[in-house]
């Protein structure tokens, strides 16, 4: 039996402002949908194209989930722990959608992850995972997760700028997205 690979990535770990977002994605097997447009979110030059691909992923992914941790959590537990927490939440959103008999593992973009426990088959088990540096360039599931996380965070920043125009005037937040 094959193992379902859940791609996970984050957006917002580096900025000085705002939430950290994570996404988890399972795409259909290659050849069943067009995966050619799915790439690392940082490689998109057009915001419009990025949003179009995000919509395509949401319509065509088998499973997907998005989660965030806010500034208060980041300040309380630190950005690294908040990132892992949002990754766990996004992964659990996907895992809850899976049939009980499906085996799965996580593919994490990056070099670190906090092991995650789930209740399965009447036991508490650690979820298998692999950290992959540059994973968003190597695996479509991770690239798709990077897109969902980035668009969700960008939408949050845009919403904040609409509600608080002074964030644009004082910090140019609409352009720099909190990266300083």
Positions of the model-derived regions?
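RNase H-like, Mg2+-dependent phosphodiesterase core
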Residues: 1-180
